[in-house]
Amino acid sequence: DVILPRVLDDQTYGTFNSLILFNNVEVVSTLQGDKPFLSDLFSQLRSKDPSSPAFRDLVRFLQEFCSLHKHLQITQRNQSFSALIGLGLFEIVTTILQHTDASLRLCGTDMLMSALSPDPAPLRTFLVEQPGHTLFSCLVKGMAVARHRHHGHCREE
């Protein structure tokens, strides 16, 4: 992104950007269409020890997958995030935001922001209906800590 514009003409740079965009859309569409894969991904996220390297890898994969959704059209993005939310995205984000690793909490925040972009209503519903309101509590604590310490997290201290 930084080096290529300096060496390529505008037309070639535009072509590369289009190829990257179409490839990202293809990756998201392919993974979204693979229901067993997504079910397995969320099952592993629920079953792995949050301190294990495997959990960290799965979280980073899910974060990247969520961030690729920005390249989708709004209707596709809504449908895709609805499916991810149905699989337990917000429950997983709740677990991630309670993690001791700040980089993983940042991943969780990024996933939450990606899920909010097409439609914030599912998150509002989840925050109200979640037993114990854990995610809401994490978000409030994170904002309070961030305000006072300039870096927030949800862990109980």
Segments and roles (model prediction):
Residues 23-30, 68-81, 92, 118-127, ...:
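Alpha-solenoid ARM/HEAT helical repeat scaffolds used for protein-protein interactions
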Residues 12-23, 41, 58-70, 93-97, ...:
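Hydrophobic residues within the alpha-helices of tandem HEAT/HEAT-like
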Residues 1, 31-51, 80-100, 129-149:
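Amphipathic alpha-helical segments within extended alpha-helical solenoids and repeat-rich scaffolds
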Residues 27-33, 37, 54-58, 104-108, ...:
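Intrinsic disorder/low-complexity flexible regions in very large eukaryotic scaffold/regulatory proteins
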